[in-house]
């Protein structure tokens, strides 16, 4: 019985204010990564839609066909070539946004890895920092 009391006392770890701040930072960054990954998926779908639109315009036979292009809440008709250029520019901008978001995810993952090392070093098996797969 004395051995189990000593084991329980050894596992009782004091959580300091700094430790709590690290745990909170880990939770905030984990939540932020989830949001960023969802945003990346939305932007990738938008990029795919733009690529599909480019492909459809290329397949159009009529070069003098006016193609409506949405700007804000209105559609403005442009020539096939102008619309193609606008779509290419939109694709380029969207890809840059995706790259920036992925870069932010990578930097947050580095912070999380560092925090995970620090927190596991102090708390060991008394803390679970692994994401739920549900």
From Swiss-Prot:
The modification N-acetylalanine is found at residue 2. This is Prefoldin subunit 4. PANTHER family: PREFOLDIN SUBUNIT 4 (PTHR21100:SF9). GO terms for molecular function: amyloid-beta binding; protein-folding chaperone binding; unfolded protein binding. Its main location: nucleus. It is found in: Nucleus; Cytoplasm; Mitochondrion. Heterohexamer of two PFD-alpha type and four PFD-beta type subunits. Interacts with URI1; the interaction is phosphorylation-dependent and occurs in a growth-dependent manner. Keywords: Acetylation, Chaperone, Cytoplasm, Mitochondrion, Nucleus, Phosphoprotein. Belongs to the prefoldin subunit beta family. GO terms for cellular component: cytoplasm; cytosol; mitochondrion; nucleus; prefoldin complex. GO terms for biological process: chaperone-mediated protein folding; negative regulation of amyloid fibril formation; protein folding. Pfam families: Prefoldin_2. InterPro entries: PFD_beta-like, PFDN4, Prefoldin. The modification Phosphoserine is found at residue 125. Binds specifically to cytosolic chaperonin (c-CPN) and transfers target proteins to it. Binds to nascent polypeptide chain and promotes folding in an environment in which there are many competing pathways for nonnative proteins. Coiled coil: none annotated.
């Amino acid at each position: 019985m004395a051995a189990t009391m000593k084991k329980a006392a050894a596992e009782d770890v004091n959580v300091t204010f700094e430790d709590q701040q690290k745990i909170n930072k880990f939770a905030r960054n984990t939540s932020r990564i989830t949001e960023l990954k969802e945003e990346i998926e939305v932007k990738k779908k938008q990029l795919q839609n733009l690529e599909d639109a480019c492909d459809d315009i290329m397949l159009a036979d009529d070069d003098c066909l006016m193609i409506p292009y949405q700007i804000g809440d209105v559609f403005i008709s442009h020539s096939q070539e102008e619309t193609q250029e606008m779509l290419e520019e939109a694709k380029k901008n969207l890809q840059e946004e995706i790259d920036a978001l992925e870069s932010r995810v990578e930097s947050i993952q580095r912070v999380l890895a560092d925090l995970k090392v620090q927190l596991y070093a102090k708390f060991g098996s008394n803390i679970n920092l692994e994401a739920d797969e549900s």
